[in-house]
Amino acid sequence: MHRVKVRVVEDALDANNTIARANRDDFDRAGVRVLNLMSAPGSGKTSLLERVLGDLGEVRPGVLEGDVQGSYDADRLASLHVPVTQLNTDPGFGGECHLDANMVRSAIPALSLDDIDLLVIENVGNLVCPAEFRVGEDARAMVSSVTELSLIHI
């Protein structure tokens, strides 16, 4: 049996991180704070946003809604009269289980950044992949359901 060792000398996410920095620069120029909201599917990200988005006082929220396909969550949030941009990973992105910086970059032109103070990126429901990909956010938050608490080690 022949063995070959390959030495990785570059971070595989360098390209993603470069685009994430460009996203961050765009958000900073517009004065927009960005939260990347992550969780397992069905943990309650959308329900949490339905409850919180209307109680932000003078803060003008916007949502970038990530899903593999469909617009159910985006439709729920749009009913709150909050600007929502749907980003499906299935068409053109191969049905990815997360949003990456390039996907977010493709959605920036559809966002009215001048009308938003806080952009919440509701990432695709997945506990593994989203944490690996920076998208240009200021902060990340995790939503966990009660049944998942035994899986989380802090």
Give the positions of each predicted feature:
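Charged, amphipathic alpha-helical linker segments immediately N-terminal to NTP-binding catalytic cores
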Residues: 1-11
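Hydrophobic positions on the alpha1 helix immediately C-terminal to the Walker A/P-loop
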Residues: 48
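Conserved small/polar residues in nucleotide/adenosyl-binding loops
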Residues: 152-154
